[in-house]
């Protein structure tokens, strides 16, 4: 992880604090793959100290949130597992399951045991956003898998809404048609992703976050019949105003360190805070 302007991370943190004062959300802070797998990198590699930064960020947000989960220790403890893809910066569905387990008490559900799921391949030979950065061609492509419930009578609908209002729908959490590569998880990133799970408990969850959040949403849909994921950097002002005016049973913030440190979230978070 390269950080070009450390001041941006502090600005984002301040904007998150302002939002948390208003919304009192639950919050998850996620490290990137290089922080968890630093032992695999050359000794000369200069790495930003994500561990300390996330600790400080969690300490700053904790007084303003119902609960803050710094996921660094959790992922470090499970570092021998495939938590991130080889060729894409997104976390795998196994990381999603670990977060799902950790969030049970905060989001008021009893997590299903891992033996209630089947590890099922969805797509082979996938390459993501990191593939072109490798200086050699010996990096193996990824297999995208999902932990699918062994028994699940729910029916699911995903609705993607782009900033210009364009809408795309699927009747599955893992659409293979109309998607490419790793985007078969919830159809990939979008400004707004609305998930309905007919048969789950009738309550709603708002998730403000980045594409890291997509790995945990399928599990949360086992316990919430309406989940709305929002990427504030992709939304229009009108969309943010509509989100701010809606009511949800719970609100979750889920951001990865690369987004917090290198992507300006301030305008979107401020729009939600002031609406």
What does each model-found stretch correspond to?
Residues 1-275:
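Extracellular glycan-modifying ectodomains
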